[in-house]
Amino acid sequence: MELYDIHTHQILLEDNDDPYQTCILDVYPLEFEVAKVTYQRHSFSCGIHPWYSEDSDYQLKYLSEIASDPRIIAIGETGLDKIKGPDFDIQIPVFKRHIELSEQLKKPLIIHAVKAWEELYHIRKEANPTQPWILHGFRGNSQIAQQMSKVGFLFSLGERFNVDALEFIPNDALFCETDESEITILEVYQQIASVLNQDIEDFASQIAKNVQRVFPTLEKPEELKI
């Protein structure tokens, strides 16, 4: 069984060389040069969180300079947040700059979304992107899952998720993550597989296929036997 954590902010040093999991570590642009030396087994997503999109011109400029690095395999996390962060007239242009980078470099987009489903829905329809857009830490309800799935969003689930929404997330649109939680990626797999009433090996196999399709350059972990 191969384990993939497509969005995490923390890799414990003792887990850095764990051969049984492969992670995509989320970093800010100015953190990347140090992180790529510290975490040599892992790949990165790099972007500016919507909470910090105000006065982000320098980080955006630097992101555009480093985002072509092959160790950066996704752009973000970026996105829209109605609860925290600057006004949307600041967040939206920064988000759209990430969309442009994603398309230019042909790298998937990792999206943070809080109560901004309608805006994201319309921005995606307008942008008509060629690259995958992944809603990380998705906790939306079944109606939101169905709506966003129809226009091509992918979904990454972590420790907390809406059980009812799983019915409306296609198997080939599902990913797993730990984000900032203290549980392991194996525990996330086990939770979701249990809700879906799927064998853990079968579930992990489907997630592996999804990851390898969307992130073809991501290093494969060794198989974990449980």
Regions found by a protein language model. Give the residues of each.
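Mid-domain alpha/beta scaffold segments of enzyme catalytic cores
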Residues: 1-226
